Amino acid sequence: MTAPSVAAEAPLSWGLGGDLLDLNVWLALVVQEHPHHGAARRYWSDCAMARTLGQKQHFCRATMLGLVRLLCQPKLMGEGVLHLPDAWAIYRSLREAEGVDFCVDTESADATLAAWVSDASLSLPARLWSDAWLAAVAESASLRLVSFDADFRRFPLSRCLVLTA
């Protein structure tokens, strides 16, 4: 028996716009030595058919900046560290790939984040502030958030996929 696709989801909800990938997914996709590279590639492959049907995997400003920054970090990348122009070229090649798009931050993301911050039941620690923003961007754009970080389950997201290694 084969395992279900990690990208499996009802076709109707896929029609809502695709996925907003967390930085950890983009990084795992491009760095072969990353411990989650295999899982990220499986997710990417599982979404191939959806991309041909017009569904997209999205960057946003936070994930674009984060990917370029991390690819240039010697402590993270070791001997594979990149210079800024090379890291930017990797981002650009991903952005130009079929089925990859850019989700623009909107005022509705601000409103979503504000509602979550004022919701005492969420009790968001400061360490999740960037995650809260990414979740708000996904929710306000009707995108499914995809991450390796289980902390995203804390947010009242309509659609979230937490990948496992």
Where are each of the predicted segments found?
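Short loop/helix-cap segments at secondary-structure boundaries that form the rim of catalytic
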Residues: F152-S158
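A structural signal for short, well-ordered beta-strand segments and their strand-loop junctions
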Residues: L20, Q57-C60, F102-V104, L145-S147, ...
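Active-site neighborhoods of divalent-metal-dependent phosphate/nucleic-acid chemistry enzymes
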Residues: T2-P4, W14, A97-V146
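Histidine- and aromatic-rich ligand-binding microenvironments
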Residues: D22, R127-L128, D149, L161-A165
